[in-house]
């Protein structure tokens, strides 16, 4: 369980941060369950709401990641992805969610966005129009070495 619900329903935040943590550090012990437990023990899990946004910046720093929030702007997102910096995006209502959902922006392929969606293998296997995704994005956090 996470944030008062089944992890599969409310755990997109810890899962997204786990994906980034393992990619950035190679430490496979920082799996979704580990990040969810960390979030719960440190006040980042909110019953009935999922994950506090602060997990993506403050929580990430506590587990050893360098991160910053950047504006939801195409050029900033593209530049960071081209530099190899993964980005966690908080999605608003649209194609990914009816309320709120965290996904990972992993790169660009032929000018289109590649993502890891903790809730959908199908979404993760295709590429996306970057403007289409950013129109649904509420906030983004970039991770770097």
Please state what every model-predicted region is.
Residues 30-31, 36-72:
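Mid-length scaffold segments of soluble, non-membrane domains
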Residues 47-49, 54, 96-101, 123-125:
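Extracytoplasmic/secreted cell-surface and envelope-processing proteins
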Residues 61, 66-114:
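Active-site-adjacent substructure of cysteine-protease-like catalytic cores
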Residues 108-145:
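Noncatalytic regulatory segments and standalone regulatory/sensor domains
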